[in-house]
């Protein structure tokens, strides 16, 4: 962002905050980096998150969602008001889940994973008590979107024998075509949750939320390439925390999750490869600090392992398992060799 535009944007945020809260802003920091939409405003006795998005409609949608959800759960930030295009929300904490979980042993990591899954089920349950199902957009509701999701398998063409002929693309698209009956936050990567001073985990950034199957939120979490929990262990967590009131039989729910997560994994892998060619590999610390794409060979291998495991759980996606395995092995070799994918 150009310096002039950045200072103009910051002035708008600070002016709106001082008008709304009737007190001076002492300092402004950028928890996700200065290029992001949200900033932490420091007042004399509190911190507040201010959000100014390029699309003001998403800001107003997010405020609307938070107000509805907060009526029935404490797993999301409190919306503190909207002034023009700027939304203010409670600061849910500086310990982002993606960084917090990397600091603990496997036992504590599993506890955090269980809480992350439980909180998602809770805010989805809260949404069912509201009128959000009548108000929210239906996500991925057209054939073009579903086809685009499945097209991600082209990323596997370079690994192993590529996409085998026995893969039934039509069956995959049919399985992924879902009526929007459940509220989803959408981007539930672990960098979009934080733990506050009260030790409570809360999710934030609801600007892309809408209606779909519901399992997509868990696909974003498990399919976060920087997420350190194995796919096998995450299935155990899903079974343990499953909400029987979500409207689905658990077996059907996990089958849909497996199919969806297979293609979600190819989309994440495609993003990683594109970024690696432009920027080279990044450090794992940078990825976690700025909630960046997992542009590191270890993270690339992780998302391939997620695709390998979940593709094997459904007969629709089982033909892709070998290619995921080959891709995983390829990135493990790159990690050993220290090889770059950056274009000359």
PLM region descriptions:
Residues 111, 248-260:
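All-alpha amphipathic helical-bundle segments outside canonical DNA-binding/catalytic cores
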Residues 1-28:
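Juxta-kinase regulatory segment immediately upstream of eukaryotic protein kinase catalytic domains
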Residues 36, 40-132:
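ATP-binding pocket architecture of kinase catalytic cores
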Residues 105-160, 180-181, 210, 283-285:
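A cross-family kinase active-site recognition segment
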Residues 29-43, 170-216:
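Active-site acidic catalytic loop and adjacent metal/ATP-binding pocket
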Residues 267-344:
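ATP/Mg2+ or Mg2+-diphosphate-binding catalytic cores
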Residues 18-25, 61, 168-178:
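Short Pro/Gly-enriched beta-strand edge/turn motifs at strand-loop
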Residues 215-248, 260-283:
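Active-site activation/catalytic loop segments of kinase-like enzymes and analogous catalytic loops
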